[in-house]
Amino acid sequence: MDGKVTYEGAVYSSGPGVEVGDIVFVEDWDGRPASEWSVQRIGVLQSKIERYTYQIYHSNRYGKHNLSKLIPRHVLVGFANEVFGFDGWKTDIEFVETKDGFPGSTSSISIADKISADSGGGTGALADRYTVIAEASVKVTLKDGTNTRMTGFSRATTPSKIESFNKAKKEAVNDALKKALLSFEKIILEHELKTKNDFYVDGLYGSKAQKI
């Protein structure tokens, strides 16, 4: 394989009212590396993550938690900047949806419960608590086009409607971003397996410049 995708010999046709020349063809390399550069760089990213998390997974104090819950956002972002360069990757928030804490409810924010201010649970003054559940999708794209997207979730309960709303949205986006950065490992593992088994028929990479 020459490592490049080619459309030579392809024949295109269009229906009534559509000109073939008006169609823009875009290669979507979602779920696979677009160049040798991304394979190498993602490998470096994984080595940094593994070194950082070695102590986490060898400490009983943390238990069996998902890695995205244990590694801080700023650590992953720092690793990404070191490995890909500050201008070598970008994030896109594809959507953020919120709803209150009641299953089946459609309103964005509402009172989830009332908690007695009296620690004894008596008839003391009541304080409103607002619970908001958020879901967000974040896409991470490297400069060669390699990309991945993940969904994150969050639940926030505070005395303020706006605070719960903002906190839930922010945490859902952060959760999605962390999962997306961590998911690059799966892309490389699958790529290695498919390459070994001659899975690709359109070339290994989609980038015109395999080495960036």
Curated annotation (Swiss-Prot):
Q: Which SUPFAM superfamilies match?
A: dsRNA-binding domain-like
Keyword Nucleus in the entry? The reply is: yes
Q: Localized where?
A: Nucleus
Query: Which residue positions does the secretion signal occupy?
Result: none
Q: How does it assemble?
A: Interacts with RAD51 and RAD52.
Please give the function described in this protein's UniProt entry.
Answer: Involved in the repair of double-strand breaks in DNA during vegetative growth via recombination and single-strand annealing. Anneals complementary single-stranded DNA.
The name of this protein is DNA repair protein RAD59
Q: Which organism is it from?
A: Candida glabrata (strain ATCC 2001 / BCRC 20586 / JCM 3761 / NBRC 0622 / NRRL Y-65 / CBS 138) (Yeast)
